[in-house]
A protein has these predicted regions:
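A charge-rich, low-complexity, intrinsically flexible signal that marks solvent-exposed coils, linkers
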Residues: 1-71
Length: 71
């Protein structure tokens, strides 16, 4: 997994792994959740990948749009 930069210093996300049709997110609690095109939708997954690369906004996005859409 790639380290999440956490530019805002308040994120609950610590790392992520992006694949062609999914993103796996590790939270500071140690829990890992996978979000796929199938369950969360391609638009959400692609936006999450962009936020992960940016290092900002991923935790907020998850809480707002895809909190329970993990595999």
């Amino acid at each position: 997994m790639e380290h999440y930069r956490n530019l805002g210093r308040t994120s609950g996300v610590s790392a992520y792994e992006a694949g062609s049709d999914y993103i796996r997110v590790r939270f500071s609690t140690g829990s890992v959740y996978s979000y796929s095109y199938r369950k969360a939708g391609s638009g959400h997954v692609e936006q999450m990948k962009l936020l992960a690369l940016r290092g900002s906004g991923l935790n907020s996005y998850i809480n707002r749009f895809v909190k329970f859409l993990y595999d």
